[in-house]
Swiss-Prot record:
Organism of origin: Chlamydia abortus (strain DSM 27085 / S26/3)
Any one cellular-component term (Gene Ontology): cytosol
The gene coding this protein: recA
Known role: Can catalyze the hydrolysis of ATP in the presence of single-stranded DNA, the ATP-dependent uptake of single-stranded DNA by duplex DNA, and the ATP-dependent hybridization of homologous single-stranded DNAs. It interacts with LexA causing its activation and leading to its autocatalytic cleavage.
GO biological process, one term: DNA recombination
GO molecular function, one term: damaged DNA binding
Protein name per UniProt: Protein RecA
The keyword Metal-binding appears for this protein: no
Residues that, per the record, bind ATP: G67, P68, E69, S70, S71, G72, K73, T74
Amino acid sequence: MNVPDRKKALEAAIAYIEKQFGSGSIMSLGKHSASHEISTIKTGALSLDLALGIGGVPKGRIVEIFGPESSGKTTLATHIVANAQKMGGVAAYIDAEHALDPSYASLIGANIHDLMISQPDCGEDALSIAELLARSGAVDVIVIDSVAALVPKSELEGDIGDVHVGLQARMMSQALRKLTATLARSQTCAIFINQIREKIGVSFGNPETTTGGRALKFYSSIRIDIRRIGAIKGNESFDLGNRIKVKVAKNKLAPPFKTAEFDILFNEGISSAGCILDLAVEHNIVEKKGSWFNYQDRKLGQGREAVREELKKNKKLLEELEKRILEVTASPKTIVEEKKEELAMQPVA
């Protein structure tokens, strides 16, 4: 078949597909309304936004946040909810653990009056609610906290001690098959918080695994591994918060396996000022001499905590430092952006 005949055959096939399945059911990626832009929601930690490579968590995708207990999973998810609301978006929180603290969420910056919350009885109800919210097209982010607490209905109705092999994994697999396409169409970000377990009898390699089977690993565009690596000491004998290290374990939108560190303070959540200060020092925007921090010809203060408090008060300086960090780190092109440029360079037939 020569080239003109191949084109005619393709055009006929496209016309039939559009007639059968509707306009826009198939299109050239570089033409029409096929968008290359990825809308994101900031995480609240600039270092993590940079590690993700796209400036935050993507809309229309599934994101998994997993880690040990008290590592900051819920705090990170709540910051994403707060940032989505600040952008004028709508957020929903499916609290399967029945453990959301409204006062802490409010302290972080979430608008609890406008936050939609659901505390379903079983896993099937939770996932159905998530799908219906996504299908509405009016919700920007849905947090499911957590996968481990999504109890299948048959397990809930049975007795303690009954064996239910692979029941939760099958439930997750079935739900995610339906949810993925709905999220993409509605541009809703679904954040699944997950716990870790240990495999029995593993002598070599990492014995840790996440609950809910393999489906969530496959369907997630981004997987964030979050860990507590130390305590932040106060002036007295008490701790101010935790030092957190995050690894991007999977990333379909930018290079994976990047890491980021930031502080989670007990009275305010993720310390944006501390995060910006660390990045400014790392990129030689702020000079650190001994315990003193200098910016251009100005002394910011002595000691990291004192400078962090000063930056919290001086919003103008904080924004200036953030702007300079973003200029210095002018992020490398994402996979999508590289593909867009490649398509633009191709000759038009």
